């Protein structure tokens, strides 16, 4: 415009402030060969010298899950290579259902001591060990083909109705209506819920 001309004042249209886009949470975890650093932490603990299974037979899983406060956290498992994708599918379904898992750490954090891992209600899989019956037979955990999920709420119960872990006593009886915390009922795997 030239000086002296009537200029129509235009009010700028305010631009809305950008809204943060939440990062989408991938519901499905990932599988990879066992990293060297993880191998080093497993050696002599969950991976003992043996002729049955090697690191190449296993996969390291990184899995998103809900904790007992319903926060999304990341856990890790080691499982057999040939079941890794199926395990990831199952945990994706558990994620979609908002199934809570208290913790999911490699058992090596507990020096590969199954009893201690269970005391901390740790969800774990691979641990080269024998079954607890005294038979000397290798456990399915020794092949990465068994997973203990929330072992406090889902304890191993002896035929006489008791278990080895006092912190799981409330859960030896499978009547979930008598359990004191809602999160415990949510973390149980069974048909009663």
Describe the predicted segments one by one.
Residues 4, 11-23:
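Ser/Thr-rich, Proline-interspersed low-complexity disordered segments
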Residues 8-10, 16, 152, 157:
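Intrinsically disordered, low-complexity Ser/Thr- and Pro-rich stretches
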Residues 23-66, 71-76, 138-139:
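Compositionally biased intrinsically disordered regions enriched in Thr/Gly
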Residues 36-37, 81, 85-88, 186-189:
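Generic alpha-helical secondary structure signal
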Residues 54-118:
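Active-site acidic/histidine clusters and adjacent loop/turn architecture
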Residues 100-145, 151-156:
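Active-site-adjacent loop/helix surface patches within enzyme catalytic domains
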Residues 131-138, 143-193:
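Catalytic cores and adjacent binding grooves of peptidoglycan-active enzymes
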């Amino acid at each position: 415009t030239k000086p002296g001309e009537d200029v129509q004042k235009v009010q700028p249209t305010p631009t809305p402030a950008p809204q943060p886009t939440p990062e989408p949470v991938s519901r499905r975890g990932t599988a990879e060969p066992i990293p060297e650093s993880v191998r080093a932490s497993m050696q002599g603990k969950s991976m003992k010298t043996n002729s049955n299974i090697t690191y190449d037979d296993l996969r390291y899983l990184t899995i998103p899950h809900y904790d007992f406060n319903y926060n999304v956290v990341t856990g890790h498992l080691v499982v057999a290579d040939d079941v890794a994708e199926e395990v990831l599918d199952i945990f994706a379904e558990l994620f979609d259902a908002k199934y809570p898992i208290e913790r999911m750490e490699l058992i090596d954090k507990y020096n590969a001591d199954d009893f201690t891992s269970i005391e901390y209600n740790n969800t774990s899989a691979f641990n080269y060990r024998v079954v607890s019956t005294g038979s000397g037979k290798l456990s399915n955990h020794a092949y990465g083909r068994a997973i203990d999920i929330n072992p406090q709420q889902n304890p191993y119960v002896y035929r006489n109705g008791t278990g080895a872990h006092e912190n799981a006593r409330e859960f030896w009886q499978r009547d979930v209506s008598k359990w004191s915390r809602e999160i415990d009922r949510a973390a149980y795997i069974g048909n009663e819920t």
